[in-house]
A protein has these predicted regions:
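Conserved acyl-donor/pantetheine-binding loop and adjacent beta-alpha core of acyl/acetyltransferases
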Residues: 61, 78-125, 159
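Conserved acetyl-CoA-binding loop-helix of GNAT-fold acetyltransferases
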Residues: 115-120, 126-142
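Conserved beta-hairpin
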Residues: 21, 68-83
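Conserved N-terminal entry element of GNAT/NAT acetyltransferase domains
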Residues: 1-42
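Conserved active-site alpha-helix within GNAT-family acetyltransferase domains
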Residues: 142-147, 155-159
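Short, solvent-exposed beta-strand-terminating loops
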Residues: 22-30, 83-94, 139-141
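Conserved hydrophobic beta-strand within the GNAT/NAT acetyltransferase core sheet
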Residues: 115, 149-151
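A short helix-loop-beta-strand connector motif used in the catalytic cores of GNAT acetyltransferases and
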Residues: 46-72, 88-94, 114
Length: 159
């Protein structure tokens, strides 16, 4: 399916687009048990302490301050997809994992960016929205200087 056939457009997360991100995630109860795409932005103890409402507020604060990155997909004017990206310093949770810390990554292969989450509205899945959103996020990363992009695939069929 072609992007044009889906009438998709993309906008980076910002204070202007926060209400669209919020609408998409509120429709799905914060996604993944109220994560609000915060899990990789903080320590797991902080994530647990915040709870769903606190995570919502935490991500909103980061977005309004320009410290959260991601790409929102729109079908017409409706937000239908999301791809979170950021630097390793921002998406720091991966680096804290035991397995990751044991990796011997050569300096030239160290990531400049990470992609942590992809989400598509449950009523619009299986139409290719996620792949187009991923491509839009990669284009935005390139626009911001590019470099090595690290991603961690995870299948969450019940989301």
């Amino acid at each position: 399916m072609e992007q044009a056939m889906l009438n998709l457009t993309f906008r980076p997360l910002s204070s202007e687009t926060w209400p669209d991100f919020e609408a998409l995630f509120e429709k799905h109860r914060g996604v993944q048990g109220g994560c609000w795409c915060v899990y990789y932005l903080c320590k797991s103890t902080e994530f647990n302490r915040l709870g769903p409402e606190g995570r919502h507020g935490f991500h909103k604060e980061l977005a309004l301050e320009g410290r959260a990155s991601g790409m929102i997909a729109y079908e017409g004017e409706t937000p239908v997809g999301w791809c979170q990206f950021g630097t390793p310093e921002v998406l720091c949770q991966y680096s804290r994992g035991r397995a990751y810390s044991k990796l011997d990554i050569p300096p030239e292969d160290k990531p400049s960016w990470r992609i942590s989450c992809l989400f598509t509205d449950k009523h619009r899945r299986s139409r290719g929205i996620a792949i187009f959103t991923l491509h839009a996020a990669l284009e935005e990363i390139a626009r911001r200087g590019g470099g090595v992009v690290e991603a961690f695939p995870l299948d969450a069929p019940n989301v």
